[in-house]
């Protein structure tokens, strides 16, 4: 807490900003018990203070300050903060943070008129509802440049922090001033703009335009003047606020690079134009209408043809017409001057007033209905003439366009008659359109004027949006305003609670995410998302027949009951009807949708718009020049073909677009939040309603903001910046001369400082601090700097003093020496020898002098030569300096160009960021739409499910509704009776109120007369007493202030001297830095020279490497040519050898012939000789050629060896050069690192010195201005003191005379005791009126301080007089009599005193004028000093620019160095490549030798392949042997069958004999058998039908499965691998299928055999003459057996069908694998043919077996065998089904993986929008890895399948071996018996499954039937519900109509 002296700079605002030192000490010493002092919850006051009396069983008894005793729960008691935290400035510092603590802190500060309070990271302000002196100019200067913790909370502090952040962080800032309507947002916005206009003035007067003779102010004046103009046209009185902004504005104040004002612009949002034509009772229209009618400028009344009575104009008089807190006359003057300052021309100004007046006249236009027609006609033309005159229109055309507008019908235009209502609505729409367009045009003109075209870098945006509104009648405007506030609150919540915590997570700080539950997304989505309120409204606007009712119904259908934030309001008595309610963050608002469609479409009369476009009033024509009328559109379509709907944009769509732009702007800035609070609803100063304030605190997230500030780390700074700024705290912690990471340096530095280590955390890039710790570090840094500076000053002063002392000592010694010599000379002066010495001495020295002259001439000549040389050098240096200056200028131009390019790049970057944000928003909208669609689908399905449940409930509801209807009718009658009684009581009360008001008026009139008499006398007395007390007080104040000013002046002079010394030191340090910079430049030049040398070396080495590469290539080409020559020589040599062999062969043949011939002729001998000679010649040639070839080969080998040796030497040289370059590279790196570190230290030192210079310059300028002001004040005060002392004597004499009069008057005031209270109230009102007058007087004369003090003294004297009035009750009669006598005598004296006072007042005015003149001169000096400061700032900026240029040079050098590094690496790579090529050439030399070895390897591989082929042949032979084995087995089976055949034939013969014997008997029972047969056939037919039905069902299932399998086969190429697995199984399946077919045929034949057996058994029974009963039993047994056989046949059929299905499934795979199968089975064709032959033999034998009747047992056994085979088939089928199920599962898994991959791909695409190509590459690599894993898995599966096949083959071989073994026959028979038992159990299971399927079928049909019945019942119930709804609506409408 600062002392009272520190607060003195705030002037009279100090007590309103911070509590005094005395109050703080009292609070600390106040007794306080922390255990018993608490806040307790209380129903009326929300929370009250109290003390705990007792605690029992979770209950606490508390005694409140009012004396009441409350017993509450533990959680309703909150501990109180200690007294030192009373009125604390930052609530985040409180010990106990809870709602009552925050509430009472705000309340106590508000009671002391401290309206600003910090709440963590933002500021809370409470509306005082009165004027406070906290915005004076001295307050602005006091806050300038102050840190947040150095000054009390204020809107100026927030503004200055934003300004400083903008300068330091180089980031755009925004100040968001939010709160409910009437909370003070507009006032705070004005103060922010005032602050920026004051502290960041440009200092340049704006040039006046030659065209307009109007006065225009500076840019800061124009920015300030924009507010009064916009408030006049955009602000109005509402229920909650006298000056409510009815539009939103975002004011951007742009600053240049130096922080000076550059320009400004204003964006406005959603002007409430409906207020132009309609206001509620307690409201009024825009201020401008009432300013014009205030008659402050009578010329406006005449020009606009209006009266001064607002009630003459219905558009502006529907509510109130005056506001107590607004002076419309003064505001008109302010508005008019603002128009002039903002540079509007006189013509534009007149047009603004004219259009405003025309809007007023529009409200008086009257129309009537024509007789016998519905059309409207004008009811008089006077008003229309005025409106048309003001708009420069023809009144007849205007009325015609209103009553008979032209409408397009087809391709023609016709005039259409309008009704009175339509014309009235059209007039209102035109008035609103004219006003709105004029307002928007004014905003664009203001922006044009504020755009000064100066360079601008950053901006601070101030947002002032209409506050949250809850009125009795809330329309579309309120929805838009509340929606804007909802979005801003969501932005605040996201910024404060979400982004802050995400920053912690991103930086790696340990942090648990806190959900504060402040998400407003539900309400925002309800309004703005697809199918939200705005979406439905815009959709309805597109339909021509849409109405408010259809809009309401759509809202109810879409959101009622589905969204928690959307409700249907309950009808309230006495209030306007509401159609729906929305739950906003600030409360529930009831909205009325009447007229929303028209408001949203905003239709205009095109004919009138066309008249406006042709108006002679340029402004009006310009306003509507962009509007597209119907006729213009038609013309446009003929010419250019403009689309119809392109210009149609609804109000809500435009509003959302502007709001989205605003949110985008805010997201791109660093926001500062100011939360405005309404203390009470009655606008009473000083009063605070607890519940209202608590509601706003909860909604605004104040407590949550404090919590995140306390728990989190709101301050953060980069490691490098922290190290640079706070290194001074402990320089020894960071070692000098060695590199250390910024993070480690920061950790060491913080560890070495004595602070709490839990108050900060280290992130990845920043260090984070708790609230307040950074301020503590700043204080420690300031103390350390002050300590260092004082030490430096002390050492400097000591050094200077020692130097001065040494000079003094030397001077003293020299004086002593001179004195001694003079004394000695005086003693010997008259001595004769001395005289002789004086005469001879010069003669002796003449010779020496000549020598000295000669030496001096030589030295002179030398110096002359040196001077000439130095002159030549100087000229050279001057020339160099000129060139360097040119280079410097060029570099500066380059820097400027690059800065401009950088600015353009930043703009492009901003645009890209905006487009990115827009695209993200679009993506988000699309995703949200998709989510909405999914939710709608889910809701529809839920509805469908609920319908069945609701059907049963609806019947109950119908009964309940009937009962409730009866109850409602009864209640209706009761309420009607109550209403009648209440109306009668109201009438009686109205009569009594009227009587009371009459009596009250009479009493007030009587009372007023007495008060007037008393007031006149009191005024006279008060003037005299005030004058005395004023003068005495002035004398005392002047004496005290004079002494203070003298002290201040001395302090200022000392500070000035100190600052001048500091400035000199800073300048010297700057010079040192410049010297260091020059040295660095020289070093850089040296490095550049070295780099150029290195570059030349590298280029030489590159050229050498290229030459070597060329040589290598030439040698390679030469080697290839030589190899080709060698090959050619080898070929020619081979040819020669061949020719030689041929010739030798011919020679031998010829010799043989010669020998055979025995003799030869001489000719033949000669021929032989010739041939031999040729042969010898050819042999010699051949030998010479071989020798030549060997010589050339040797020469080539030698050359090649030489070239290899040369290449080796060159490679060694290159390696040596490489080593040298690497050494130089490392040295260069070290030097570069040294330079970089030097540059960093220089730049840091430069930055620190620049900051010090800026602060010192600011302090110097402030001290100069303060010194001049103090000097001026001292002079003025001394003059006033003398003058006032002379006047005080006269006043004292007059006061003595008047005191006697006062004593007489005081004795006569005792009779007014009964009227004291009334007098006090009237006196307070008078005091308020005098306050207002005093404020106006102070503002006009710029003399606020003195007159305010005088006024306060007057108030004190009045209070004393009031106390005197209360005592003087008994002397009223005497007072009246004395007053009548004395008043006549004292009138003359009073008139004389009045004259004297007038003279003194005139003198005082003259004195004020003189003071004003002095102020003007001081202003000029101030301006001159400011110019000097700006020049200094320009110099600093130049140095900054030079430093930036050097930095840029350094960066360029770094880039060049990096390029050379890259080039070096490339050359290194090329050198390595050349080495590799040399090595490859060396290897190629040995290729010829290795070719033979490779051929040997190939031979070995061929041998291995041959072995493999032999192995395969052996495998095939083994397979053939296996086929032979199979043939052998089949032959054995054939033998067995032939034996069985012989046995069967023998039995057959026996059977035929018995058959012939029994044929006669068969005829008798034939009839009975036929009957049995018919029954059996019938049953079989029924079973066949059922089987067919099942078969069809199974066929359908099979077809569906087949389609699925086909799709799976088509979709996957992986099935090819599975086909390999199925190849072996397919062959077996074919065998099994054929076997099953044969078994089925055998079963059929067995069935027939059983019939024969039945006949035989019956014959045997007749022969044995058994009874009829035995025959029947046998028949029954036969029937059962037949049934069993039939069941077996059905099972066989089922298995056959299953095998057929599996065969169909396998056929598709067979087709694909047929080619490979044919290749593989070509060797097995012979075996298959033999197998077929055997199968045909078996079938023949089986055909013969059909005739056998007696071998039933063998047939049954075969049937059992067939059954076992079928079981095996079933098992194999089951296996196949398992494999298919496995395939299905694999398919599903693969589909799932495909979906996952697709999902990942979608995510990757989304991430690609954010992450870019790197993320895509990562995902692609991941996909490739997954694909590789899938392929490896598939390979493993294929290998497993191959192994499985091998194992299956091995198993088959083993089974064949076991079948050959005869010993296992018995075991196999036992196995067959067991299998038969299993088959029977399988039969039973199949029967049970069939029965279960039948029962399931029946259940399914039953359920389907029930479902259909339920749907029918639901349809019936739904129709009944609709009927009931219609009935209930009818009843509801009846009830409403009856009410």
Curated annotation (Swiss-Prot):
- Provide this UniProt record's keywords sorted from A to Z: Actin-binding, ATP-binding, Calmodulin-binding, Coiled coil, Cytoplasm, Methylation, Motor protein, Muscle protein, Myosin, Nucleotide-binding, Phosphoprotein, Thick filament
Where's the Myosin N-terminal SH3-like domain? 33-82
Q: Which residues are noted in the entry as ATP-binding?
A: 179-186
Residues that the record marks as modified (Phosphotyrosine) are: 389, 1464, 1492
Record's Gene3D superfamilies?
1.10.10.820, 1.20.5.340, 1.20.5.370, 1.20.5.4820, 1.20.58.530, 6.10.250.2420, Kinesin motor domain, Myosin S1 fragment, N-terminal
- Record's compositionally biased regions (Basic and acidic residues): 1128-1147
Taxonomically, the superkingdom here is Eukaryota
Give all residue intervals belonging to the IQ domain.
785-814
Read off the Pfam families from this record.
Answer: Myosin_head, Myosin_N, Myosin_tail_1
SMART domains on file: IQ, MYSc
| Residue numbers bearing the N6,N6,N6-trimethyllysine modification | 130
Q: Where is the protein situated, by its record's location annotation?
A: Cytoplasm, Myofibril
Care to name a GO molecular-function term for this sequence? actin filament binding
- Start and end residues of each Myosin motor domain: 86-782
Residues bearing PTM Phosphothreonine: 64, 69, 419, 1241, 1255, 1286, 1467, 1501, 1517, 1730, 1736
User: Which parts form a coiled-coil structure per UniProt?
Assistant: 843-1939
Gene Ontology biological-process annotations: muscle contraction
Q: Which family does it belong to?
A: Belongs to the TRAFAC class myosin-kinesin ATPase superfamily. Myosin family.
Q: How does it assemble?
A: Muscle myosin is a hexameric protein that consists of 2 heavy chain subunits (MHC), 2 alkali light chain subunits (MLC) and 2 regulatory light chain subunits (MLC-2). Interacts with GCSAM.
Cite the domain annotation text: The rodlike tail sequence is highly repetitive, showing cycles of a 28-residue repeat pattern composed of 4 heptapeptides, characteristic for alpha-helical coiled coils. Limited proteolysis of myosin heavy chain produces 1 light meromyosin (LMM) and 1 heavy meromyosin (HMM). HMM can be further cleaved into 2 globular subfragments (S1) and 1 rod-shaped subfragment (S2).
User: What's the protein called, per UniProt?
Assistant: Myosin-2
Q: Which organism is it from?
A: Sus scrofa (Pig)
